[in-house]
Amino acid sequence: PDFHTATMPLGDDPDGETDIYATVVRYSPTDAHRLHNRPAMLFVHGMSDYFFHRHVAEFFYQCGWAVYAIDLRKCGRSWRPGQRWHHTTDVAQYFEELTSALAYLSEMHNTVVIQGHSTGGLVVALWLDHLRNSAPELHAHIAGAVLNSPWLDMMVPKPVSETLKPVLRWAGARWPNVSMPAGNLTAYGKSVSAEHYGEWVIDPEMKPL
């Protein structure tokens, strides 16, 4: 009852799947009518993720923030039948819903801080750079950005990364929907999930471990 959602229709999917949507989540306790007097914080999740962090929303609300989050297209609450979970061929596609969400927040809040986690940190950094050139009047509402464990580089030594970049660009342009082998990446998910070793209740369909 303390969380409300608003769905943003985004129209046709540039990757050819069903119509896409994004979802803005707002933490709205009983005194939420006073939210417009607060600065806003917008959380942007990472890859294969969604917003479920009640304790984070409660903490920042108690610190004086109006707390929002966005589930990006095909992620979490924004997924629709006929779509591959979390699939995009270009992270710049996320700029559309982030700009729309910021426009919505700027109608109620003079100040907005963006918090991006993991791949969300990469997306936020790229989006804000794009926004300052494409919509400076909206960018003016941004007071800062917090990048939480941002994925800004590959998890391999620099010489390996530089060698692989042209190969991956070539392969990605020709086979954009082919998945790369990733090995076992379950350690982090299990470490935070209450069903394994952590404390958080996570929907395994929205956030596969």
Feature names for model-found ranges:
Residues 1-35:
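N-terminal cap/lid segment of alpha/beta-hydrolase-fold proteins
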Residues 37-46:
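Short beta-strand element of the alpha/beta-hydrolase
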Residues 38-39, 65, 109-111:
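Short coil/turn segments at beta-strand junctions that form active-site/ligand-binding loops
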Residues 47-48, 76-111:
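Catalytic nucleophile-loop/oxyanion-hole region of alpha/beta-hydrolase
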Residues 49-57, 61-82:
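Conserved alpha/beta-hydrolase
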Residues 116:
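The Walker A (P-loop) glycine that initiates the GxxxxGKT/S ATP-binding motif of P-loop NTPases
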Residues 119, 123-209:
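Alpha/beta-hydrolase-fold enzymes
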